[in-house]
């Protein structure tokens, strides 16, 4: 961490876990296992030490959002309208964004039992493969130019205004957008938006996605650790793909282990590391909270914007 984070307060895990006094995790070990991504590692103790204090912090921000909305409505002499509380979660490929997002969705559902808590990933706003091929962008998939940012911003605008919104659905099994399939959202109380690009902005857009966020999280780790996690995840995906000839990764499933590792390492260095260093990591100081992971996936440091 550098002077880039002068506006953040660094909090150790030991200090952070004292910010929530309850010892009950609100979910079972089986539930935790079911939402943990391939090769990620999270324990009930992590839920208690890290995520329960985080739920408390989100509640602080939600109350502040509601109070501000109420006061603005009075000032403008307009009817009071409760808007969805939107949480953005960003970080590198293979850093554990999906696990964090699903865990927060579950915990928010448990702590706000009468609330609708939804989750959307920005993968659905990638351009379809055919379009990327036609534009010569398939090898840039995941980079800023491969996303339909206008559609994504329109989606967030509809959500923020309490309107029904629809998001395309992406499948990692086919490595593409699923044709004619949409995920619908009808004015949820909470919306979690997860993706590598949630703090980014293309040059031709005046809006940032983060303009719509009420709270935001960046999952951080040393790039050498993320590389290891990426390769481990790739090998796990290949094991699963052996059982499904229609899976996109089935074409790599018969590679000898050494070749599979070499292939994954090359993809990491030529695609994912470049994307991380040029476009993802430089946006992390836009987050309200940074969760830093050590080599064993455990969150060891927390950075909260002052």
UniProtKB/Swiss-Prot annotation:
This protein's pathway: Cofactor biosynthesis; coenzyme A biosynthesis; CoA from (R)-pantothenate: step 1/5
Compartment(s) where it occurs, according to its Swiss-Prot or TrEMBL record: Cytoplasm
Keywords assigned: ATP-binding, Coenzyme A biosynthesis, Cytoplasm, Kinase, Nucleotide-binding, Transferase
Enzyme class at the top of the EC tree: transferase
The protein, known as: Pantothenate kinase
Chain positions recorded as ATP binding sites: 91-98
GO BP terms in the entry: coenzyme A biosynthetic process
EC number of the protein: 2.7.1.33
Assigned protein family: Belongs to the prokaryotic pantothenate kinase family.
Gene Ontology molecular functions: ATP binding; pantothenate kinase activity
GO CC terms: cytoplasm
Domain of life: Bacteria
Catalytic activity, as annotated: (R)-pantothenate + ATP = (R)-4'-phosphopantothenate + ADP + H(+)
A Pfam family assignment: PRK
């Amino acid at each position: 961490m550098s002077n880039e984070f002068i506006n953040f307060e660094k909090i150790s895990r030991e200090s952070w876990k004292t910010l929530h006094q309850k010892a009950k995790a609100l979910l079972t070990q089986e539930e935790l296992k079911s939402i943990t991504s391939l090769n990620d590692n999270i324990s009930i103790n992590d839920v208690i030490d890290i995520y329960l204090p985080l739920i408390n912090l989100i509640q602080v921000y939600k109350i502040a959002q509601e109070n501000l909305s109420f006061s603005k409505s009075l000032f403008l002499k307009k009817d009071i309208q409760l808007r969805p509380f939107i949480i953005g979660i960003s970080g590198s490929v293979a850093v554990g964004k999906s696990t964090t997002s699903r865990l927060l969705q579950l915990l928010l559902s448990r702590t706000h039992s009468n609330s609708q808590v939804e989750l959307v990933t920005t993968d659905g706003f990638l351009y379809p493969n055919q379009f990327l091929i036609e534009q010569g962008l398939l090898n840039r998939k995941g980079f800023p130019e491969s996303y339909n940012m206008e559609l994504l911003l329109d989606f967030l605008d509809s959500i923020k205004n309490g309107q029904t919104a629809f998001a395309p659905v992406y499948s990692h099994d086919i490595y593409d957008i699923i044709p004619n399939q949409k995920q619908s959202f009808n004015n949820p109380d909470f919306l979690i938006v997860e993706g590598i690009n949630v703090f980014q902005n293309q040059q031709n857009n005046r809006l940032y996605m983060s303009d719509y966020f009420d709270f935001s999280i960046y999952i951080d780790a040393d790039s050498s650790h993320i590389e290891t996690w990426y390769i481990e995840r790739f090998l796990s995906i290949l094991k699963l793909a052996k059982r499904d000839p229609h899976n996109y990764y089935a074409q790599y499933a018969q590679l000898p282990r050494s070749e599979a590792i070499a292939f994954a390492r090359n993809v990491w260095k030529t695609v994912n590391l470049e994307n991380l260093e040029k476009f993802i990591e430089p946006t992390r100081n836009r987050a309200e909270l940074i969760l830093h992971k050590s080599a064993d996936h455990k969150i060891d440091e927390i950075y909260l914007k002052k």
